């Protein structure tokens, strides 16, 4: 969207690629015979299957949900203009099938950029961008901070689906598991039913930008910028009655098909006025003064409708008035920010530089006592290469030392009204009066007039170096960042009448070293460039809310002062309980169950035996890229890696637990028995509440070849200025010890203190062929 037109001949560019993606990894699970044997063990002395050997390998449910998926992208652009007016137009079409069946993503986009010089003093311009996104979604994995949530996503359904059951009835309709084997398998779901659930989302976005530049007099310029970002979305969900088992259909008001229509609209308006003065005086002194005034207003509103109890699946979302039960809700929110910035940049002899910045930001989301925050910054640089003592060191082409110190603010962690007292109505607040349900209202948030900006103060020292006529470039940085007044929602005693409060609690430190090296190794007919980077970061919680040094974030993770984010605390695994000794209140302590270590040697297993077993922060992460060209051929590649991090594999924890009904991972074929005293996997009738141990805190370090590309550029021919064809492979190789779907998984998205894998949408390997043409 930033491509601008240029003065000169009109140019047309067409870029396109076509390819295919697939997930190559499958979770190894028990086949039908092995599963039948396990079921018989669990339900002994009442076996489910008379002869397990008759079932063979059974149904491969993972193959039934995955597919090879096509992908294509087309980009057409036109640029041109004259000395007064420049125009750039573009159109894009992107179509990606999901590697899980019934999922896809389509995008249509148009853009137009216009710049026009009215006179020597006035210039105007605009950028317009319109996009339509249509997608069919699938919930691949569980998203709750709960070790049992893995079963709720499609990947969990496919792994846990009994291979002895049938996917379809004889008439071709989906066969609910609860309707097979006399309802024995009602606790597990046919994954094809989840694929049949409609989850369609349509998003329309219009982004408009306009600017006016005025040259008031030499050196003094004014620029006004106006932005409007308008987004409308529609989400349609429908779960058909055709996938509901017969027993559940006996309660049609609840289970006979369900629908949801969710519409949303957001509007973000931004204005910035920028005044800049640049001057050079006495030849050696440069001065740049900038003042900025900005304001932004965000509005979001939604209308939601849910319905259930449909008589048939004919109309789905389009006739919710035919449902037995229907509910509606709506919401609207508004927030605003304004900013004031002043900056002075001074340079002397293109050798010494200093930059002073003062910024004030205000946000309506914060408490009435702290709407505004002050964020100053200073930076300086010394171009050592310009000093006379560097003249003998001719192999240096650049050498610069720089440093900075400054404060920034964050408001993204809170919503529009989290500093205010709010109320809830409907649902659990409703009550009965005169035999009529009345909508009730109750307070649900404690106000916090002191809710304020989260502030990060960082200092940085860096060195930029280039040698051998810029053939080798090195950039090194040391940084130390401390974040105070963290925006955080903490739990409070229920006796308060509330469950949580949002405030500024705690502080966090990040410090580390970054190193980037770029080299032009060969510069002749064969050209070879390479670059690499590595970052070492240390992360530590400095304080919490002042009343405690530790906060539990889940059943296996904590926030703790002095430790990094994403700390895992569990019991230590001690193999299999070979003697049946008690291990923990709430656990059976049966022979063949998991055993944990008595850390404090007090003769019992309790909370005092929980220990920190790792954290999600990597010791370092790195990347490497290279490119070669010879004659008309070109080659490039990129790999990345992470080392030293841990990830709680909740997916593996779930499917190494032989509860019965659901299938389990293939390792359980070597489970404990009196004739096979394994020390790795529990016996068949030990399913239930397994202890959370370090067994499932895995090393998720990895090295991944992200992409390699081989291309060829054809000679210029008539009206074709250039034509390049290429092939690319993405996510080609991953080296890791991690046993989950993907070592980069985090089921809680971008959260910085929850790290676990409940089975997220797996990374796909892809191969594409593309062309780039210029006319």
Predicted regions and their residues:
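Conserved small-residue
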Residues: 11-56, 304, 417, 503, ...
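Extracellular/periplasmic, surface-exposed regions of secreted and cell-surface proteins
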Residues: 36, 43, 69-72, 107-109, ...
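Residues embedded in well-ordered regular secondary structure
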Residues: 4-101, 139-144, 164-199, 212-215, ...
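Glycine-rich, aromatic-lined ligand/substrate-binding cores of catalytic
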Residues: 615-648
């Amino acid at each position: 969207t930033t491509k601008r037109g240029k003065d000169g001949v009109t140019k047309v560019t067409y870029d396109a690629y076509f390819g295919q993606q697939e997930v190559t990894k499958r979770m190894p699970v028990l086949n039908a015979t092995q599963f039948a044997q396990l079921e018989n063990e669990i339900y002994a002395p009442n076996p489910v299957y008379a002869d397990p050997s008759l079932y063979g390998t059974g149904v491969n449910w993972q193959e039934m949900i995955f597919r090879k998926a096509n992908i294509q992208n087309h980009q057409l652009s036109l640029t041109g203009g004259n000395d007064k007016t420049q125009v750039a137009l573009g159109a894009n079409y992107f179509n990606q099938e999901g590697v899980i069946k019934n999922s896809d993503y389509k995008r249509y986009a148009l853009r137009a950029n216009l710049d026009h010089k009215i006179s020597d003093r006035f210039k105007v311009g605009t950028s317009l961008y319109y996009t339509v996104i249509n997608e069919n979604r699938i919930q691949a994995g569980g998203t709750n901070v709960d070790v049992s949530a893995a079963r709720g996503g499609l990947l969990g359904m496919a792994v846990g689906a009994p291979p002895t059951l049938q996917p379809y009835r004889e008439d071709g309709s989906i066969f609910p598991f609860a309707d097979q084997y006399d309802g024995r398998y009602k606790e597990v779901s046919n994954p094809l039913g989840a694929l049949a659930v409609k989850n369609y989302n349509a998003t329309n976005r219009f982004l408009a930008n306009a600017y006016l530049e005025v040259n008031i007099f030499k050196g003094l310029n004014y620029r006004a910028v106006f932005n409007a970002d308008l987004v409308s979305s529609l989400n349609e969900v429908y779960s058909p009655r055709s996938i509901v088992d017969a027993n559940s259909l006996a309660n049609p008001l609840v289970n006979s098909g369900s629908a949801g229509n969710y519409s949303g609209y957001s509007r973000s308006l931004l204005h910035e006025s920028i005044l800049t003065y640049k001057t050079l005086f006495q030849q050696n002194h440069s001065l740049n003064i900038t003042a900025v005034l900005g304001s932004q207003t965000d509005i979001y509103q939604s209308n939601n409708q849910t319905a259930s109890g449909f008589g048939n699946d004919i109309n789905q979302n389009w006739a919710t008035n035919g449902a037995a039960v229907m509910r509606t809700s709506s919401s609207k929110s508004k927030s605003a920010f304004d900013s004031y910035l002043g900056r002075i940049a001074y340079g002397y002899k293109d050798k010494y530089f200093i930059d002073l910045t003062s910024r004030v930001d205000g946000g309506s989301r914060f408490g009435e006592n702290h709407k505004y925050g002050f964020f100053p910054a200073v930076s300086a640089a010394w171009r050592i290469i310009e000093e006379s003592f560097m003249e003998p060191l001719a192999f240096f082409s650049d050498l610069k030392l720089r440093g900075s110190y400054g404060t920034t603010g964050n408001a993204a962690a809170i919503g529009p009204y989290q500093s205010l007292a709010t109320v809830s109505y409907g649902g659990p607040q409703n009550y009965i009066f005169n035999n009529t349900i009345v909508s009730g209202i109750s307070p649900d948030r404690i106000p916090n007039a002191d809710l304020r900006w989260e502030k990060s103060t960082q200092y940085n020292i860096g060195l930029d170096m280039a040698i051998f006529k810029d053939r080798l470039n090195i950039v090194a940085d040391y940084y130390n960042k401390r974040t105070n007044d963290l925006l955080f929602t903490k739990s409070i005693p229920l006796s308060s009448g509330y469950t949580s409060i949002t405030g500024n609690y705690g502080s966090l430190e990040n410090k580390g070293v970054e190193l980037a090296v770029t080299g032009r190794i060969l510069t002749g007919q064969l050209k070879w460039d390479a670059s690499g980077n590595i970052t070492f970061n240390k992360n530590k919680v400095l304080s919490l809310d002042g009343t405690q040094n530790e906060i539990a974030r889940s059943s296996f993770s904590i926030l703790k002062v002095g430790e990094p984010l994403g700390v895992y605390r569990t019991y230590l695994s001690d193999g299999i309980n070979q003697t049946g000794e008690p291990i923990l209140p709430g656990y059976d302590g049966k022979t063949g169950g998991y055993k944990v270590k008595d850390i404090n040697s007090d003769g019992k297993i309790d909370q005092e035996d929980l220990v920190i077993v790792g954290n999600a922060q990597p010791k370092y992460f790195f990347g490497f890229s290279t490119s070669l060209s010879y004659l008309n051929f070109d080659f490039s590649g990129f790999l990345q890696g992470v080392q030293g991090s841990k990830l709680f594999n909740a997916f593996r924890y779930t499917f190494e637990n032989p509860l019965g009904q659901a299938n389990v991972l293939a390792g359980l074929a070597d489970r404990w028995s009196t004739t096979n005293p394994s020390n790795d996997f529990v016996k068949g009738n030990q399913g239930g509440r397994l202890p959370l141990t370090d067994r499932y805190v895995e090393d998720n370090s990895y090295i991944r070849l992200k992409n390699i590309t081989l291309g060829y550029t054809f000679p210029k021919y008539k009206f074709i200025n250039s034509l390049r064809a290429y092939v690319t492979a993405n996510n080609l190789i991953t080296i890791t010890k991690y046993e989950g779907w993907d070592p980069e998984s985090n089921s809680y998205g971008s959260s910085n203190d929850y790290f676990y894998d409940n089975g997220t949408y797996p990374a796909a390997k892809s191969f594409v062929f593309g062309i780039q043409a210029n006319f």
